């Protein structure tokens, strides 16, 4: 049995005037001469949860210990799951949490649209969206398949009546990407902006919010995971200029994806690293960035609000919209930009973690929205690409190769969609663990 010795002068637990070793005094302010590494309980201070504060001496001054928010585990908030279709009803497990947003794509059929479903709009045949089309929600779901339910460890898919099935064709291979937000709302908000929302309509970190609704447009439902920097917001447009609505996060979003769910509209995407706050991209096209002159997104984007104009892309009167908002979280997610060098030894993009999923888009010229993950390719180089803007099947080629490393990802190709010399690119990445 191992023993631990406590030696006087090295570890001093309760002698107010000693200046040696590790110190845990219980009196008031320590009056002796401090030494670096000492710890004290300063009863003249106060904290949010205690009448006294633990402090440490850094060699110059006494400093309070500060609680740090734990870094979210990637596997608790994002996961990729592969599955094979059965042309019926199928429960997909292994996600590791109950998703609030799941994005599905067939890997081996170029006629299959993407299928995006979230807990705010709900599941079922009337709620699917496709990132590669302008269609309203549910336009393709009943015929081509849909996600019918979220569960504690995944989701259920239902084949449609028409081939090809977007989510569950017999023997077809699929990839699913799932994110955790704040839980499924249990009600639709009927309160106006500035008022307390209908109970259960705004879910922040799994709890129904009682805070007043931010913005000039009252969100109808919100699901936000503040620790993971991801929220889902539904709202109804009013057709007016210079409007705002709350996003439910506690930091400024760095990537905002919006879709008119009532009608046929493009998918505008705002990113912090575009030319200006008025610029945006389209998720469903390969187009370069464009200037919306404030009619789409505008300077109203803040730590509580998303600012929009009167464009039909984001704010037609009486039309319904869905927004997916993201910001970087150290150790879990990173949203940023880089400049290509045109070499197969391309830029190394520091993320602070090993990526599990990366999406890249060139902004100054046409290119697809390229997606790589660590489940379709388990080792470097990662060469299997799906494109959010296309129904095309998975491409596997060294032309699209990138490496996932412990602290970054590196572009190891010179393709236009990844690494043209002088080209500007945005990316969003999520951690493996």
Where are these regions (language model features)?
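Assembly/interface hotspot detector across virion components, adhesins/toxins, and nucleic-acid enzymes
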Residues: 3, 10, 55-57, 147-148
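Hydrophobic residues embedded in beta-strands of well-ordered beta-sheets
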Residues: 46-47, 52-54, 62, 155, ...
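Short hydrophobic/aromatic-rich beta-strand motifs
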Residues: 23, 30-57, 100-105, 256-258, ...
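Extracellular/surface-exposed low-complexity repeats and stalk/linker segments enriched in Gly/Pro
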Residues: 4-47, 66, 74-89, 231-240, ...
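Surface-exposed molecular-recognition determinants
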Residues: 67-433
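Tryptophan-rich substrate-binding surfaces of secreted polymer-degrading and adhesive proteins
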Residues: 58-68
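Generic structural signal for beta-strand residues in well-ordered domains
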Residues: 15, 32-33, 47, 55, ...
């Amino acid at each position: 049995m191992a023993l631990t010795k406590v030696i006087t002068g090295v570890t001093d637990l309760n002698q107010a005037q000693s200046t040696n070793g590790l110190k845990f005094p219980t009196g008031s302010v320590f009056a002796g001469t401090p030494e670096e590494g000492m710890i004290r309980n300063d009863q003249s201070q106060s904290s949010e949860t205690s009448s006294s504060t633990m402090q440490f001496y850094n060699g110059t001054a006494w400093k309070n210990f500060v609680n740090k928010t734990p870094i979210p585990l990637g596997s608790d908030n994002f996961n990729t799951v592969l599955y094979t279709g059965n042309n019926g009803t199928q429960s997909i497990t292994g996600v590791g949490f109950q998703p609030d947003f799941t994005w599905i794509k067939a890997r081996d059929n170029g006629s299959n649209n993407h299928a995006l479903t979230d807990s705010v709009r709900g599941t079922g045949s009337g709620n699917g969206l496709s990132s590669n089309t302008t269609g309203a929600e549910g336009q393709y779901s009943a015929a081509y398949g849909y996600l019918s339910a979220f569960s504690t460890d995944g989701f259920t898919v239902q084949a449609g009546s028409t081939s090809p099935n977007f989510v569950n064709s017999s023997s077809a291979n699929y990839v699913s990407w799932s994110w955790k937000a704040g839980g499924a709302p249990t009600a639709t908000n009927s309160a106006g902006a500035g008022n307390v929302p209908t109970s259960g309509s705004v879910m922040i970190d799994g709890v129904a919010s009682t805070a007043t609704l931010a913005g000039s447009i009252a969100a109808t439902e919100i699901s936000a995971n503040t620790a993971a920097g991801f929220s889902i917001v539904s709202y109804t447009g009013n057709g007016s200029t210079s409007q705002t609505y709350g996003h439910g996060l506690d930091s400024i979003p760095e990537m905002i994806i919006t879709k008119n769910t009532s009608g046929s509209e493009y998918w505008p995407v705002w990113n912090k690293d575009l030319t200006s706050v008025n610029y945006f991209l389209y998720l469903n096209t390969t187009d370069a960035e464009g200037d919306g002159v404030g009619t789409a997104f505008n300077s109203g984007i803040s730590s509580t609000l998303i600012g929009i104009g009167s464009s039909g892309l984001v704010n037609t009167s009486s039309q319904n919209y869905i927004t997916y908002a993201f910001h970087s979280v150290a150790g879990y997610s990173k949203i940023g930009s880089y400049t290509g060098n045109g070499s197969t030894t391309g830029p190394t993009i520091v993320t602070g973690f090993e990526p599990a999923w990366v999406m890249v888009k060139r902004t100054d010229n046409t290119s697809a929205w390229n997606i790589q993950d660590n489940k379709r390719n388990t080792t470097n180089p990662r060469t299997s690409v799906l494109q959010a803007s296309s129904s095309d099947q998975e491409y596997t080629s060294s032309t699209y190769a990138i490496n996932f490393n412990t602290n970054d990802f590196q572009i190891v190709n010179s393709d236009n969609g990844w690494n043209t010399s002088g080209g500007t690119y945005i990316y969003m990445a999520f951690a493996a663990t």
